[in-house]
């Protein structure tokens, strides 16, 4: 855990060394639910930073007058400032995916790439969220979808995830009766965040490389929503076969293999271009990334002095189908953005 300048407590886990990768968890969970996945991702050459969002895990709630999803993204940004991380790949699952979209749109120059795992986003999802409080039929459909998705996952995930989504619906249905804290505050922030299309278009316009991975059998956020996210953000889209909403948690080996596959493809291309812009000779040189993207006296170094990670065990195998390939932005333009951000502040043009 760390404390920000204003005293706000934030839960953080750090592991590995290399390209900073910030991970944001799903609704009602915490960073700890993903540690089996993230320890394996760290072994691929990443400095993994998992952050508990407000009201989850070890992170304290936000004040009542800071209940927007943008306020939650701002807390993550301030956490990165405190840790001394200049730029990072930002990844999120479910609610964390929606929060990742907000963060990338707010500070695009600090985001090397975006990875969205079954993100709670897309025009269809936004429309469902907008009508859920007014339509008993939509509430029933949401509950049915959640239960259907849980049926395909292991029993403990069925119980846990069904509980989370029923609690979310309860929070929405009771409106202002419940205090906007913890789970209720996060659920309400999602429900009140409006359409994310404009934010996805910022990602497109700023040419932030984005990869969308979505379970083919996700009944909570249907694959149609992932297609809409990819179209709006100009993202590369993969359909993960035999995967439901919580596949990252239930099968962390497959989750880690999906990141490895990205490194062999779209994400590897992004990092090669970024390495060239930063003067890194070998994009797989984890020490070089560490020097360029993490401040020498950064707090994150004290949290991970031995570059702790569990290492890769028996590799899983994920079945990913490429559905949409992003229109490649001009590499020179994106590289210029990377170089400009990492220039000393007193050397940047006013």
Please describe what each predicted stretch is.
Residues 5, 50-91:
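Active-site loop/oxyanion-hole signature of alpha/beta-hydrolase fold enzymes
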Residues 8, 13-58:
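Conserved HGGG/HGGXW glycine-rich cap/lid loop of the alpha/beta-hydrolase fold
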Residues 105, 114-145:
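Flexible "cap/lid" loop of the alpha/beta hydrolase fold
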Residues 125-130, 144-205:
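Conserved alpha/beta-hydrolase catalytic His-Asp/Glu region
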Residues 206, 212-214, 218:
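Short beta-strand/loop motif that positions the catalytic acidic residue
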Residues 216-221, 245-246:
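Acidic catalytic loop of the alpha/beta-hydrolase fold
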Residues 222-230:
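Short alpha-helix in the alpha/beta-hydrolase fold that links the catalytic acid
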